[in-house]
Amino acid sequence: MKFVGAHVSAAGGVDQAVIRAHELEATAFALFTKNQRQWRAAPLAEDVIEKFKLACEKYGYTSAQILPHDSYLINLGHPVTEALEKSREAFIDELVRCQQLGLSLLNFHPGSHLLQIDEDQCLARIAESINIALDATEGVTAVIENTAGQGSNLGFKFEHLAAIIERVEDKSRVGVCIDTCHAFAAGYDLRTEEDCEHTFAALGKIVGFQYLRGMHLNDAKSEFNSRVDRHHSLGEGNIGKTVFSYIMRDSRFDNIPLILETVNMDIWAEEIAWLKSQAEIEPSL
């Protein structure tokens, strides 16, 4: 079963994200549970939690179909202790919010060394941050997203993701989300079926498909191996549509949220419908 949707707005309340996903005829969705560009947010009120859970029940969304994203401000590999502590506290709060909403996943960007510590030190800090956060919470899996490698962001190599996972103590509560635009911009080609075979074989070998908890389905305005993160609508960028059809026909991507973060939300419903149609084609495996 393929779960397909988009990162929808939670303006007006988190329950509104559920309604917006339903209106797109999505079978999955992503959301922010708080303002993604602010450190602090009011705690979730009981009535807000209840409305969200009721909306999910009404429209048939389980936690396996929902991939919340944390704040963009959080840097779990921050080289400065005070800033690192602030990020860790905020990340724990994000996990708690997911827990309260009955969600089982939290997607996040791993972190940046800001040119002040080396890659391995930063990866170790990220893993330590995850361990601290998992110890302080329960029931929610920390889902590390690959990055385009823009600036000093880590996570652009599959080896980075594997190194973090290796250091996480509770392997049952860590996973990865692969963003196709980020992978392409980081040098993982996805333009042909053969490219897809090679890239996903590398993912399986280096990270392991048992850790795959979600996908972000985005074409790229950015060039191949440019280390620039610029999303585009499916088929309108430099990747093309092949990889998205490939994913929809491959059982390794079943039962996880497959989320659009493409640039034109006016055509999300069309993109979702097209993705669903690809799942009906003979499987690639």
UniProtKB/Swiss-Prot annotation:
CDD domains for this protein: AP2Ec
Q: Which GO terms describe its biological process?
A: base-excision repair
Enzyme Commission numbers on file = 3.1.21.2
What class does this enzyme belong to in the EC scheme? hydrolase
User: Binding positions for Zn(2+) 1?
Assistant: 69, 109, 145
Q: Which UniProt keywords apply?
A: DNA damage, DNA repair, Endonuclease, Hydrolase, Metal-binding, Nuclease, Zinc
Per the annotation, how and in what number is the cofactor bound? Binds 3 Zn(2+) ions.
Which cofactors are named for this entry?
A: Zn(2+)
Molecular function (GO) terms for this protein are: deoxyribonuclease IV (phage-T4-induced) activity; DNA binding; DNA-(apurinic or apyrimidinic site) endonuclease activity; phosphoric diester hydrolase activity; zinc ion binding
Q: Name the residues that bind Zn(2+) 3.
A: 182, 229, 231
Q: What does this protein do?
A: Endonuclease IV plays a role in DNA repair. It cleaves phosphodiester bonds at apurinic or apyrimidinic (AP) sites, generating a 3'-hydroxyl group and a 5'-terminal sugar phosphate.
Protein name per the record: Probable endonuclease 4
